[in-house]
């Protein structure tokens, strides 16, 4: 139990006292007046009278030239945008918010990519994420508060009637306030970027990556702020009450997040759209950036429409009744504004249609309820096949063509299936990966077969063999499969197959029999749909489960061979000895083959790598044999490569002496993008996230050497999983 004593108690008391004092001081000193009165009214009047006595009443006032064209409106927009920007900068309340925000950022300090208490080097993407996280709510405070202040600025100063009588478009007025507030965001963003660069410099890190700063703030934070600012101005214009408007903006923001959690998260109706996602040194923003920008443009155009509507129904003059303001709105709709609105509306509809075409036609969109119903139906209809006797995969021989720039692949080859049971097998059940981009182009079996497509909606096929498979007999299953990327999907789609740093495993390929991973997982939802409770662990002597006890349930161990092709700048890696490497048709090819059986669980990795190589010597019955040690890493991520290499050697020494001989001729570590934050062991290969060890800033005197530790942990799995189960 955590006890509030000692330093923890004093810390909490200090900040509570600080907060109370700040609140009292702010309450006493805060002033909503636009102009601070530094002199008494009597002195101001005396000064004005004294000045007027020296004024020449015969001064000739020049004639004003009347202009009402677009150039005139553009000039107004620029001047008023600058005016409102400066007016906010001059307000003490604004700098009070900024100073409080900076204090909290400093107090929270900077924890960058912490892994078990070990910070990472101050890479730009870590700095950007930290600044985004700590400053986001202060941006929201400024947005909510100053959108109300700007809409009510003239009425707060009681100059609204004079202001409303000017020959100025209501839209230009509101747009000027909108741009002025966005300029405030830009200034704060520049300040945050500058502080990030200063922090990197002080920390001795000089790879600033300005494009990452730009993307993180000007493509991610600023568009969201602009879209919500449009909404805030619309609400303030609609309700005609500053404080009610502020509350409604806050309530809307909360509800918007809540409905997304409840499943209404499609980018076409989730206000503002989804976030950009993580940046990776290996893959940048990858394929996520283009759809993100399209969706943000869609919502920005919607925000402009809200701004136009807000300007039309805004209070101008003495009329405050909403119904009457709506009736008056048509008289404010000038021809230039109407044309501008038509262009915005037309573009908004076209982009919305384009998004719908990509997310709902080219790709399939499932709501949470639809996905749940599918899982329920899958289990109710196919559960009968869970323990049906099936052959085991004993050989895998594949040729994979990977196209990183298109995010596609094509694979063909065969599985050798062996009947390891004592029963005749008349039908083989095949489950395709339930992903729309994956297509099984063909499947065939030696000796002839017929296909039962009764469960096609689940991508589950039953192949009735012409000749039943006798115990200990084998049959080859030939197949061709492709993964084809079509447009863009809803949300941050597939992060396994990317431009640089592809990492997926053999779950992509056809599997045998019923697959429990497609069952409904949540126990409450299972009860609602009358499904039995799932058992986390089977009894140790359960004969049905013992048949499929290994990690690859459809295999007891395989001989593996693959030829894999990838783009010319990349290296493709899978388990096994590298028999041959060559280039053909401007593509790199690699031929791998295992010399000992492995579990049916292997990874495919491809990226543009730097390589560090070494050797470790193993003793096999008195004969010394070399094991190739290789670390494939992103250029610039060499900070902890030596630690990882030492860990590989030390781990192999210890485990070989205390467990058994290491069974492969190589051990490879391959870095993959930080879309996931783990390392995972496969036979002879260890895919390793760039965020979990490669950029850790390890202090040998005070930190746990996490790069060494994680590597040692994963190497241990080469025995406890890879060797035990193979």
Predicted regions and their residues:
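Helix-loop-helix units of permease transmembrane domains in multi-pass membrane transporters
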Residues: 148-184
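N-terminal, polar/Ser/Thr-rich
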Residues: 336-408, 525-537, 547-554
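Secretory targeting signals
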Residues: 109-113, 121-138, 175-240, 279-281, ...
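Terminal transmembrane helical anchor/hairpin motif
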Residues: 1-29, 36-37, 242-328, 359-364
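A surface-exposed beta-strand-loop module
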Residues: 424, 435-500, 548-549
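Glycine/proline-rich low-complexity spacer/linker segments in large multi-domain proteins
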Residues: 366-369, 481-556, 614-616
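Hydrophobic alpha-helical transmembrane segments
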Residues: 16, 23-147, 151-155, 309-376, ...
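Hydrophobic helix-coil surface modules that form long, contiguous segments used
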Residues: 72, 76, 80-83, 92-112, ...
């Amino acid at each position: 139990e955590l006890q509030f004593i000692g330093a923890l108690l004093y810390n909490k008391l200090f900040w509570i006292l600080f907060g109370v004092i700040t609140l009292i001081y702010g309450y006493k000193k805060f002033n909503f007046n636009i102009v601070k009165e530094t002199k008494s009214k009597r002195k101001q009047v005396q000064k004005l009278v004294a000045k007027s006595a020296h004024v020449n009443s015969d001064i000739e006032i020049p004639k004003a030239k009347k202009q009402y064209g677009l150039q005139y409106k553009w000039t107004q927009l620029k001047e008023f945008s600058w005016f409102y920007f400066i007016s906010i900068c001059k307000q003490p309340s604004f700098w009070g918010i900024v100073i409080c925000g900076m204090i909290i950022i400093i107090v929270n300090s900077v924890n960058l990519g912490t892994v078990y208490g070990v910070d990472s080097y101050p890479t730009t993407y870590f700095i950007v994420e930290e600044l985004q996280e700590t400053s986001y709510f202060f941006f929201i405070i400024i947005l909510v508060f100053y959108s109300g202040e700007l809409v009510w600025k003239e009425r707060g100063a009681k100059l609204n009637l004079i202001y409303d009588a000017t020959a100025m478009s209501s839209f230009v007025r509101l747009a000027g306030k909108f741009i002025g507030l966005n300029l405030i965001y830009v200034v704060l963003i520049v300040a945050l970027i500058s502080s990030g660069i200063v922090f990197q410099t002080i920390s001795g890190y000089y790879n600033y990556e300005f494009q990452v700063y730009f993307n993180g703030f000007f493509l991610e934070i600023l568009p969201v702020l602009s879209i919500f600012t449009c909404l805030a101005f619309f609400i303030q214009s609609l309700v005609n009450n500053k404080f009610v408007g502020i509350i409604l903006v806050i309530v809307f923001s909360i509800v918007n997040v809540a409905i997304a959690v409840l499943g209404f998260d499609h980018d076409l109706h989730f206000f503002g759209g989804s976030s950009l996602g993580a940046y990776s040194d290996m893959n940048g923003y990858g394929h996520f950036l283009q759809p993100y920008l399209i969706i943000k443009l869609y919502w920005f155009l919607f925000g402009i429409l809200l701004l136009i509507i807000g300007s039309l129904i805004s209070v101008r003059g003495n009329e405050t009744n909403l119904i009457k303001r709506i009736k008056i709105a048509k008289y404010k709709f000038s021809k230039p504004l109407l044309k501008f609105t038509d262009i915005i509306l037309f573009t908004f509809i076209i982009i919305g249609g384009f998004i719908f075409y990509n997310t709902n036609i080219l790709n399939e969109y499932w709501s949470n309820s639809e996905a749940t119903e599918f899982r329920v139906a899958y289990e109710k209809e196919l559960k009968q096949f869970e323990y049906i006797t099936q052959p085991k995969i004993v050989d895998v021989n594949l040729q994979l063509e990977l196209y990183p720039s298109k995010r596609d692949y094509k694979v063909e080859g065969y599985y050798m299936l062996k009947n390891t049971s004592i029963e005749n097998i008349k039908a083989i059940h095949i489950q395709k990966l339930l992903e729309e981009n994956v297509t099984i182009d063909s499947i065939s079996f030696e000796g002839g077969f017929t296909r039962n497509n009764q469960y096609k909606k689940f991508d589950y096929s039953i192949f009735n063999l012409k000749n039943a498979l006798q115990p200990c007999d084998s049959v080859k299953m030939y197949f061709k499969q492709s993964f084809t990327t079509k447009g863009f999907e809803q949300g941050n789609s597939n992060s396994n197959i990317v431009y640089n740093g592809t990492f997926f495993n053999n779950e992509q390929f056809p599997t045998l029999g019923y697959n429990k991973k497609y069952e409904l997982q949540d126990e409450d939802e299972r009860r609602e749909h009358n499904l039995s409770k799932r058992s986390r662990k089977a009894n140790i002597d359960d004969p049905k489960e013992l048949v499929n006890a290994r990690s690859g349930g459809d295999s007891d161990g395989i001989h593996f061979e693959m030829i894999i092709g990838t783009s010319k700048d990349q290296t493709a890696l899978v388990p096994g000895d590298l028999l041959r490497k060559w280039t053909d048709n401007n593509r790199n090819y690699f031929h791998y083959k295992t010399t000992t059986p492995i579990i049916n669980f292997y990874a495919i990795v491809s990226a543009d790598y730097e390589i560090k190589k070494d050797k470790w010597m193993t003793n096999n019955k008195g004969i010394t044999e070399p094991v190739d040690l290789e670390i494939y890493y992103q250029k610039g991520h060499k900070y902890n490569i030596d630690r990882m290499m030492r860990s590989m050697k030390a781990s192999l020494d210890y485990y070989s002496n205390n467990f058994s001989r290491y069974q492969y001729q190589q051990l490879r570590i391959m870095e993959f993008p930080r879309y996931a934050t783990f390392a995972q062991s496969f036979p002879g290969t260890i895919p390793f996230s760039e965020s979990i060890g490669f950029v850790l800033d390890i202090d040998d005197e005070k930190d746990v050497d996490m790069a060494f530790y994680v590597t040692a942990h994963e190497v241990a799995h080469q025995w406890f999983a890879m060797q035990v189960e193979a």
